């Protein structure tokens, strides 16, 4: 089996050498042809010796070679399982499989040895997507989107053994009605969030990792008119709005990793960051841009975009709802957009209209369930007398932590009314949650 893998990999590498113009789809098609030829020659040779080989075995062999060329080899079945949420690999022998229902199982070895495991990751990084990525001694970390849509992060050299984590976004095609069905929002929130998008207001979706920020952004994006010209910008393509068939004019933009020596600007040769791409995106005559996740320096052009565009959205990792504005200010000052807290606050109030906070309660370790829901929707009203942002929680947490209407909006009231939003929805002060939050320990997080 390993000989077949290596033969197909060598032929594929020779085919791609010096040619960077093929799309991932073209590379996959070429790889399938090469794999089929290699497997067919192997089966024919065995049959010529008189060995009986079933057709089903030939297909299984082909699937295994393709998993080696374009997938994660022995890990591929786990990453393809729709019930699996995370796969964690620590060295070739230790595999942890985390299921959406909270189960944790030990998987079979990921490879024969660490070297083979690294080869698998390096191969899929180089052939699996349009913007080639690498995992090397000089570039010991890797972040990428796998062909099946899962997200992969990997490290080596700086860790005792290669580390790989894959994460599945189990809900790709989703709208706000689906979010009501998932009990992540209630009908009141559903109508309000739709109005926010239709009113072209700028939004940050914040929350801890795994709280459903990206899924909610996908759902809110379905309220963007189908024919609107807009962009998504990500370090690794993850939102997938260009793949749903629901948008005629969405442009997915992905950052490009650099390789080799550092240039005069201190960046690896060939690197194109989101920070660099933002100014050019602003010149494409778009109304809005959606950024999958703001982590670092891209916070600066993101707020520049929000200052000049309408209806933009991004996600941000924050542990607590009351820490969102401070986290934004911290990033703006760290990356040079402001030299004081007051300067950061001015940037925030000029650019941002709403903060939506997504929370998570995970009681699986004590025999319960995992719950993801919106807990806050906060309007950024303006700058207060103390040179701090004035905000008001249009929705705030009820006794169980889930969002309930609190007050009517101030700054954005007219814009929301122009979308047809009925303010009477906000008089449902108990909310309209379709199911109780079935927690073992009462109260919010």
Could you tell me what each predicted segment is?
Residues 213:
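Conserved lysine of the Walker
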Residues 90, 98-199, 244:
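P-loop NTP-binding catalytic core
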Residues 206:
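Residues at the beta-strand->loop junction immediately N-terminal to the Walker
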Residues 368-445:
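NTP-binding/hydrolysis catalytic cores, primarily Walker-type P-loop NTPases
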Residues 209:
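The conserved Walker
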Residues 345-385:
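Phosphate-binding/switch region of NTP-binding enzymes
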Residues 1-135:
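N-terminal accessory targeting/assembly segments
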Residues 203, 219-349, 359:
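Switch/coupling sub-region of P-loop NTPases
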């Amino acid at each position: 089996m390993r000989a077949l893998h290596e033969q197909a990999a060598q032929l594929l590498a020779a085919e791609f050498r010096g040619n960077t113009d093929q799309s991932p789809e073209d590379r996959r098609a070429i790889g399938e042809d090469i794999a089929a030829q290699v497997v067919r020659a192997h089966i024919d040779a065995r049959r010529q010796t008189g060995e009986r080989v079933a057709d089903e075995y030939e297909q299984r062999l082909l699937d295994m070679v393709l998993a080696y060329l374009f997938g994660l080899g022995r890990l591929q079945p786990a990453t393809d399982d729709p019930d699996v949420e995370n796969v964690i690999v620590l060295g070739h022998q230790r595999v942890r499989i985390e299921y959406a229902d909270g189960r944790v199982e030990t998987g079979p070895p990921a490879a024969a040895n660490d070297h083979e495991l690294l080869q698998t990751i390096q191969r899929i990084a180089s052939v699996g997507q349009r913007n080639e990525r690498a995992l090397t001694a000089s570039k010991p970390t890797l972040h990428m989107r796998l062909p099946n849509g899962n997200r992969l992060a990997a490290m080596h050299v700086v860790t005792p053994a290669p580390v790989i984590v894959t994460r599945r976004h189990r809900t790709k095609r989703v709208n706000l009605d689906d979010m009501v069905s998932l009990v992540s929002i209630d009908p009141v929130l559903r109508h309000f969030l739709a109005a926010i998008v239709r009113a072209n207001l700028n939004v940050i979706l914040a929350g801890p990792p795994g709280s459903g920020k990206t899924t909610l952004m996908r759902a809110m994006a379905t309220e963007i008119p189908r024919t609107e010209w807009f962009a998504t910008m990500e370090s690794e393509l993850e939102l997938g709005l260009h793949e749903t068939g629901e948008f005629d004019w969405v442009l997915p933009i992905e950052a490009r990793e650099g390789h080799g020596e550092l240039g005069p600007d201190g960046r690896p040769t060939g690197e194109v960051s989101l920070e660099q791409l933002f100014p050019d995106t602003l010149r494409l005559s778009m109304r809005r841009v959606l950024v999958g996740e703001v982590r670092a320096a891209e916070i600066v052009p993101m707020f520049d975009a929000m200052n000049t565009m309408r209806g933009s959205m991004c996600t941000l990792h924050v542990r607590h709802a009351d820490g969102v504005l401070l986290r934004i200010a911290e990033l703006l000052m760290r990356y040079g957009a402001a030299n004081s807290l007051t300067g950061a606050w001015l940037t925030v109030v000029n650019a941002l209209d709403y903060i939506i906070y997504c929370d998570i309660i995970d009681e699986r370790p004590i025999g319960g369930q995992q719950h993801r829901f919106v807990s806050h929707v906060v309007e950024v009203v303006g700058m207060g007398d103390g040179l701090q942002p004035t905000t008001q929680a249009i929705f705030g947490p009820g006794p169980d932590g889930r969002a309930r209407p609190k007050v009517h909006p101030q700054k954005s009231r007219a814009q929301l009314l122009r979308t047809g939003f009925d303010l009477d929805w906000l008089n449902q002060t108990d909310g309209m949650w379709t199911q109780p939050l079935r927690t073992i320990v009462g109260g919010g997080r």
